[in-house]
UniProtKB/Swiss-Prot annotation:
It catalyses: (2R)-O-phospho-3-sulfolactate + H2O = (2R)-3-sulfolactate + phosphate. Its EC number is 3.1.3.71. It comes from Clostridium beijerinckii (strain ATCC 51743 / NCIMB 8052). One of its GO terms (molecular function) is sulfopyruvate decarboxylase activity. The keyword Magnesium applies. Its cofactor is Mg(2+). This is Probable 2-phosphosulfolactate phosphatase.
C-alpha cells in the first residue's frame, strides 16, 4: 500500500487518482455532514456542484422523500431545508430520506474524483473506521482534501494525518509520499486537534458565524463506525 495526499479540490488530476482508492475529506463540514446523515438513517446523499442542479433533480422526487442541504460561504442556502451543520442532520429529519446536497468545497472534490477505483468519505468522526477499511482493501490510496476555495486547508490535512497514523498503528509496512509523511508528523505533534485547527482560516470563518458547536463536533475522533462510499453519483453505506 502506498498513501498520497492531494491538498485541495483544485489540485485533483486524473493521473493521481486513477485506479486508486480515494478518501474525500472535508471535516468543516461536508464529509462530517454526509457521515452523520447516513449514520442517522438517511437513505443516500447525492452531491451536486450547483444549487441549480440540486433543485432540478429535486423536481423528480416526491417532496416527502428528500431533504435539501448545503451552504455557500458557510451559510445556509435560501430555500433549503438544512444548512451544512452536521448537528442538523438528526434521525427525525433524515431517516429514510434522500439528502440532496451542494457545498462550496466538498462536492467539488467528490465530483472530480471519478477516476478513482473506489471513493470513500472520511472525517475525524469516522477516522478509525476509514483506516480499518483501507487496511482491509490493501491497495494504493490517495486522500483528497477538499481544501477551502481551492487552497490548502489545515483542518483537512491534520485529519489525513490522523487516518494515516491509525493505519500505521496496525501496519508499519506502508509507503508514504513526502506529503503523507508530513501530515502524519503534524498529527503526532498536535494530537489535541483544537489547538491546531484554531490557526486555520476556515476555523476563523466558522467561529465568526457562531458555529462553535459544529467545530467541537467535527473534531471528535472516531465516534461513528460507518464508511460511506460514493458510487454512480450517490453516497451510501454498505
Amino acid at each position: 500500500m502506498k498513501i498520497d495526499i492531494i491538498i485541495s479540490a483544485d489540485d485533483i488530476v486524473e493521473s493521481r487518482v486513477r485506479n486508486k482508492i480515494a478518501v474525500i475529506i472535508d471535516i468543516f463540514r461536508a464529509t462530517s455532514v454526509i457521515i452523520t446523515a447516513l449514520d442517522n438513517g438517511a437513505r443516500e446523499v447525492i452531491p451536486y456542484l450547483t444549487i441549480e442542479e440540486t433543485l432540478e433533480y429535486a423536481k423528480k422526487l416526491s417532496r416527502d422523500n428528500y431533504i435539501l442541504g448545503g451552504e455557500r460561504k458557510a451559510v445556509k442556502i435560501e430555500g433549503f431545508d438544512l444548512s451544512n451543520s452536521p448537528l442538523e442532520y438528526i434521525k427525525e429529519k433524515v431517516e429514510d430520506k434522500t439528502v440532496l446536497m451542494t457545498t462550496t468545497n466538498g462536492t467539488r472534490a467528490l465530483t472530480k474524483s471519478m477516476e478513482a477505483k473506489r471513493v470513500f468519505i472520511g472525517a475525524m468522526i469516522n477516522g478509525e473506521s476509514v483506516a480499518k477499511k483501507l487496511i482491509n482493501i490493501n491497495d494504493d490510496v490517495v486522500i483528497i482534501n477538499a481544501g477551502t476555495n481551492g487552497n490548502f486547508s489545515m483542518d483537512d490535512f491534520i485529519c489525513s494525518g490522523y487516518i494515516i497514523n491509525r493505519i500505521l498503528d496496525v501496519n508499519r509496512n506502508i509507503e508514504l509520499t513526502d506529503i503523507a509523511k508530513t501530515a502524519c508528523m503534524i498529527y503526532k505533534e498536535n494530537i489535541n486537534i483544537l489547538s491546531y485547527v484554531r490557526e486555520a482560516s476556515h476555523y476563523s470563518v466558522m467561529k465568526s458565524l457562531g458555529l462553535n458547536n459544529d467545530i467541537d463536533y467535527c473534531i471528535k475522533k472516531s465516534i461513528i463506525d460507518i464508511v460511506p462510499e460514493y458510487k454512480d453519483g450517490k453516497i451510501t453505506c454498505e
